[in-house]
């Protein structure tokens, strides 16, 4: 059995770790609250843009735009959105599992990866995939300007023909308890069907619909991409909260068990000393 000093040292170590996991849980909860607001605010905007684009498509059925172009697929870009750090349970593992399953549907030479998050870079640099672009340290550090630049770059690669399709692998945030890894096509843009059962609004477009279609389409892509990044970050934080909560709970169990062992060892030591004193006293008689 370990000595009393060793048990106390281990107990102190676990208590220190528990303080750290509690702090990380609180920080993640605070950040999640801020990101949840962004996710909630973006959804109505994306839906409304979808409705406008859908209405434009209906009244100008012959409309054409480069972002809608469907062409022979020679090069595919796959954006994989993971975390910058671990300590978030199976969050990163689930993303890589879904991404790898999707990547198997293409020949290796067809695919170029666009990696978001240090964990994605660390994972795929060890594997035989072509990496076009890496973006680390994102999360709360990512500004609106950087997101706009990133989305513009994706659209540029598609428009100049360097990539014929662009797919996104990310985590869709539903609730604190519910998250789902999604594999979703970003470009070319498919027919947009807003999830609304309301009667279509009869918009008055000024200037004419064809002139404003492209601008709204670009705005839609920007907003959609920003929304996806926010959802991924919210999912990461939610996963980290649960992981840290579980770690804190496990630390409680270990502290309880070690405290019991410490008390037993201390009691055994006291009993041993008492026996030695009693034996010594008997020997002096």
UniProtKB/Swiss-Prot annotation:
Ion transport in keyword set: yes
One Gene Ontology term from the biological process aspect of the record: proton motive force-driven plasma membrane ATP synthesis
A GO term from the CC aspect: proton-transporting ATP synthase complex
Bilayer topology: Peripheral membrane protein
Entry-linked CDD domains: F1-ATPase_gamma
Pfam families for the chain: ATP-synt
InterPro entries in UniProt: ATP_synth_F1_ATPase_gsu, ATP_synth_F1_gsu
Localisation per UniProt entry: Cell inner membrane
Gene3D superfamilies assigned to the protein according to its UniProt record, in alphabetical order: 3.40.1380.10, ATP synthase, gamma subunit, helix hairpin domain
GO MF terms, alphabetically ordered: ATP binding; proton-transporting ATP synthase activity, rotational mechanism
UniProt keyword list: ATP synthesis, Cell inner membrane, Cell membrane, CF(1), Hydrogen ion transport, Ion transport, Membrane, Transport
NCBIfam families: ATPsyn_F1gamma (TIGR01146)
Function: Produces ATP from ADP in the presence of a proton gradient across the membrane. The gamma chain is believed to be important in regulating ATPase activity and the flow of protons through the CF(0) complex.
Subunit architecture: F-type ATPases have 2 components, CF(1) - the catalytic core - and CF(0) - the membrane proton channel. CF(1) has five subunits: alpha(3), beta(3), gamma(1), delta(1), epsilon(1). CF(0) has three main subunits: a, b and c.
Family statement: Belongs to the ATPase gamma chain family.
Protein name: ATP synthase gamma chain
Record gene name: atpG
